[in-house]
Amino acid sequence: MRNGDEVQGWLSDLEFERFGTVRRLLKKVLINPLANYMPAGLMRAVLRLTESELAAANWADPGGWRSMVISYDGNPRQIADKLLVHGGAMPMALRNRRRLAARLLARLIERAPVEPAHVLSLGAGPGIITTDALAQARRKAYATLVDLNADAFEYGREYARRAGAGNRVRFLAGDIRTHIHEMLDHPPDVVEMLGICEYLTDEQVVSIASAVNRVMAGGAPALFNSLSMAHGNDRFFRRVFGLHMNHRSARELQALMGQAGFGDFLSIPEPLGVYHVIIGRKGG
């Protein structure tokens, strides 16, 4: 992407969460090894005893929208959750990704060729980042938010209402690969695929991105993210939370999106290096 300097300028005033040197060292030599290698049964028992809402949300739906909201809000009630949400690299990186992606999406909306711009959000859950972007953008836009499961939609509608965007979001349940023409009243000017690629196989990433690419105008942007192992707790997530994620480098994910017809990529890491938020554009 030729305007990388311009994109960096969009982010200059954002505040992100970071680890200090001492805290980073403690996580590497003490905290992460304990979390990753303590008996999983013991850790689950402790989390149940302390009534961890974050753990319960992941046990019910690993990586689902409820656990994401707990991490986003950053204000849990239980002591165990306070430690996890404020001390864990993944929740901190999630909040960084939210700030970074919402700003990028808002600026992409402002540069859409039409007004109001149409945002298509895939794997939307409650659509928090999309709603944040609609509220931030200085031009009019509306969003179609699609997910296979409608469970998060009520929360999403209420969140959008409180953000002043309640009349600009439309939630739909279904598979975009087979029903895209029924779901869209207008081709998307911007596509958002945040927080889903890490739960998809390579084949699923390509098939979903290809379906969307076919209805986008040439040069229209898509926003998505890769997930790296920099959080340091994959073993903990798998053993204790039952959360299995697909880790890819930014280049590996860009290669998959390239197979679906996207190119001209720009990758922006959040400060912890766990997520790279990537802008790609439809070729042609």
PLM region descriptions:
Residues R2-G41, L49, G63-S71, P76-A117, ...:
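Class I (Rossmann-like) S-adenosyl-L-methionine-dependent methyltransferase catalytic domain
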Residues D189:
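Conserved acidic residues
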Residues E192:
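A conserved beta-strand element that flanks and buttresses the S-adenosyl-L-methionine
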Residues E198-L200:
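A short His-aromatic
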